[in-house]
Amino acid sequence: MGTFCSVVKFENLQELKRLCHWGPIIALGVIAICSAMAMIDSVLWYWPLHTTGGSVNFIMLINWTVMILYNYFNAMFVGPGFVPLGWKPENSQDSVYLQYCKVCQAYKAPRSHHCRKCNRCVMKMDHHCPWINNCCGYQNHASFTLFLLLAPLGCIHAAFIFVMTMYTQLYNRLSFGWNTVKIDMSAARRDPLPIIPFGLAAFAATLFALGLALGTTIAVGMLFFIQMKIILRNKTSIESWIEEKAKDRIQYYQLDEVFVFPYDMGSRWKNFKQVFTWSGVPEGDGLDWPIREGCHQYSLTIEQLKQKADKRVRSVRYKVIEDYSGTCCPLNRGIKTFFTSPCTEEPRIRLQKGEFILATRGLRYWLYGDKILDDSVLEGVSRIRGWFPRNCVEKCPCDAETDQAPEGEKKNR
């Protein structure tokens, strides 16, 4: 626990505001309900503390809760690690291999990406997780993955307690008739009688907690296997997408080149050790990374620059012909536009008649692009980009001649 205490200090207490979000509220609520009900069921109705097995079981339940909460808060409050504001590579000549972030006023270090929610460039960013209200990245990847492992294991233990409690409490209350089965919930037929009878309210609460435990085991368990796949390959979700686009770019232009992902060390054990260490602190500093033979530190960033240049070539300029409020599912834009709204966390952008948009990808009834801002407004302002209805814009005449479809548009028609 030394890592947690050394990073989360008094001056970082402003991070407590991360708890004021629907994700942590739901996550902590599920943990509290499952833990509390498992302990109550064990002590009162299933495995009393005066028995050896009951004591061991109770200690294990407390242990699960402590370890789950420790790794959860570690992932939330320690965070992924952010690229320092104004960061530049040690060798100024290397800046040509890096993208520049206008919001952070810094170059994007290898493997880092800008998060719109955190409003910072994140080291080795995998994704922004709403359940911890923070990004998963370089510093908290191990804690986040351990939380994904411990939560299902603890829920499996709790689910066992719930099932056995309901079974033992209901078994002697069942009465079978010729055509009916009745359950007497008035009192327990057990000697000695429990301090609090297992009534209808207790049964409903236990059944509800069982549903939460089983749902958490399945959902969070799947996320754990996804994260382990990422760790063993040393390739984040974003980097997998970059690699896929690299192959598409090479195939589209029929180039005589091969993209090799530079951070997979060729050994799952070596990849694993970069995230999980005995000290609890991941290897490296989050800015410079070990690379495989035949690659160099900027192999991935150079590919990103190529993809960015290719996206600019493929982008299409549109003019806004009708205002759009930026709502997720606009009813006034037509029934098809309403029902085909993109299912993504990416934002919608407000449009005003006369503005210009540079579209980079699209669906049949929606487009995604950047607003073209004036030079007087552009400096110091982050890019305004997102989804908008296709029927709010028209293609500019100069781009209509090329008839170049935005990326992804043909595939989604």
Swiss-Prot record:
GO molecular function ontology, one term from the record: protein-cysteine S-palmitoyltransferase activity
Signal peptide, first to last residue: none
Catalytic residue list: C129
Stretches of the chain found on the membrane's Cytoplasmic side: 1-24, 79-143, 216-413
Lumenal side of membrane: 46-57, 165-194
Assigned protein family: Belongs to the DHHC palmitoyltransferase family.
Function per UniProt: Endoplasmic reticulum palmitoyl acyltransferase that mediates palmitoylation of proteins such as AMFR, CALX, ITPR1 and TFRC. Palmitoylates calnexin (CALX), which is required for its association with the ribosome-translocon complex and efficient folding of glycosylated proteins. Mediates palmitoylation of AMFR, promoting AMFR distribution to the peripheral endoplasmic reticulum. Together with SELENOK, palmitoylates ITPR1 in immune cells, leading to regulate ITPR1 stability and function.
Annotated protein name in UniProt: Palmitoyltransferase ZDHHC6
